[in-house]
């Protein structure tokens, strides 16, 4: 089975050496994705706004893979400050409330101090149809 690499155009992917997503068969693995606007390489200060942008970035990668947020089966949330997590819930509920993937929230440092959340997902194409 061959794998297909998906890029968002983020400079991080090129500089570090990874793909935004990797597709193998009907499985899509989306890398940890932050709230950067990859076109401008800017990021909002607010964790809720970052969460919304994370989800938009993930949705774009999934679409390139032929999947959608409805196909997400596993999600991981990484936040430097666990106290920020409740502020993300409205955006997360809007994206995953009906999907209800398996989920984990971790508190850990991120690569840039401006990053307040990173989201990683796994999806199975067509599973949410």
Residue ranges, per PLM feature:
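N-terminal presequence-like segments and the immediate start of the first folded domain
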Residues: 1-56, 60-74, 79-129
């Amino acid at each position: 089975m061959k794998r297909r690499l998906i890029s968002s155009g983020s400079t991080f992917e090129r500089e570090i050496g990874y793909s935004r997503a990797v597709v193998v068969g009907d499985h899509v693995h989306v890398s940890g994705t932050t709230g950067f606007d990859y076109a401008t390489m800017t990021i909002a200060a607010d964790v809720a706004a970052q969460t919304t942008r994370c989800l938009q970035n993930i949705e774009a990668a999934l679409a390139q893979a032929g999947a959608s947020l409805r196909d997400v089966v596993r999600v991981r949330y990484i936040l430097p400050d666990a106290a920020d997590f409740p502020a993300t819930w409205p955006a997360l509920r809007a994206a995953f409330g009906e999907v209800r993937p398996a989920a984990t929230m971790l508190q850990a440092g991120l690569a840039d101090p401006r990053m307040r959340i990173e989201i990683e997902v796994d999806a199975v194409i067509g599973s949410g149809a």
